[in-house]
Amino acid sequence: MRGIWFSELQTPDLAISVRLNQTLHHEKTPYQELAVVDTEAYGRMLLLDNIIQTTVKDEFFYHEMIAHVPLNTHPNPRTALVIGGGDGGVVREIVKHPSIEKVTLVEIDARVVANAREYLPEIACGLDDARVEIRFEDGIEHVRQRENTYDVIIVDSTDPIGPAVGLFSAEFYRNVYRALKADGVFVAQTESPIFNSRLIRRIQRDLKEIFPIARLYLTTVPTYPGGLWAFSLGSKKYDPLEVDWRQAPKVATRYYTPAIHQAAFSLPPFVQEFLEAPEEEEF
């Protein structure tokens, strides 16, 4: 294999490797190691602590599915909070919705936003929308201090290691419930159903104790571990399987459609199996 290759060790026994054209930027921020690289296969790629966060080639699978599912589940979302997501991809999708009046992006690391703006403009372009407020602070604390504030809350976090662990806790989900308005909707990325089944099962059980409606849905993300990714949704009122598509806005997407929205909640048997398994059982 000629050239320089980057490998992300996704599990102790699995790595994904891509050939690099060049490293565009590298630094150690106050919070993490950050790099932007240009690759043969996926174009420009954002790495945090040597973990692939997003790529120009496949980012739309993830960003469209984490954003449009909750935004179309809620019939009239006006205020949205994004925790994490400093690359701007989720915000870009949110501001496509005409009902949105304000988006608050809470990102702890200002350098992520700065580098996304410079090196990933096609992903970060929504950050300059007049409806967007960017706050560089801790998302856990931000949610803890809010009550009855947001129609939609989206958690676009890194993996559950280090400071991000708190974003996967039952205490955080209870605070999210309080921060949502009476008919609010919440979605978080919740890792790989292939490699993180116990985590997903625990999160689903936590959400079912907190929200009247709790569901899991899936999408493909080629550069993420296993290529299949899970999102956990909690809703105070609206069921994502009962969207009135006649009223939903028509927004430009590359992956998400009403049919894919519905199909994403149709879980394969292996996922149903681990969701229903006793807590002590491993997969």
UniProtKB/Swiss-Prot annotation:
CDD domains linked: AdoMet_MTases
Keywords from the UniProt entry: Cytoplasm, Polyamine biosynthesis, Spermidine biosynthesis, Transferase
EC number per UniProt: 2.5.1.16
Family annotation (PROSITE patterns): PABS_1 (PS01330), PABS_2 (PS51006)
Molecular functions per Gene Ontology: spermidine synthase activity
Localization of this protein: Cytoplasm
Keyword match Cytoplasm: yes
Family annotation (SUPFAM superfamilies): S-adenosyl-L-methionine-dependent methyltransferases (SSF53335)
Residues annotated as binding S-methyl-5'-thioadenosine: 32, 107, 138-139, 163
Catalytic activity: S-adenosyl 3-(methylsulfanyl)propylamine + putrescine = S-methyl-5'-thioadenosine + spermidine + H(+)
The protein's enzyme class: transferase
Free-text function comment from the UniProt entry: Catalyzes the irreversible transfer of a propylamine group from the amino donor S-adenosylmethioninamine (decarboxy-AdoMet) to putrescine (1,4-diaminobutane) to yield spermidine.
Quaternary structure, from the entry: Homodimer or homotetramer.
Family per similarity comment: Belongs to the spermidine/spermine synthase family.
Listed HAMAP family: Spermidine_synth
Name assigned to this protein: Polyamine aminopropyltransferase
Gene: speE
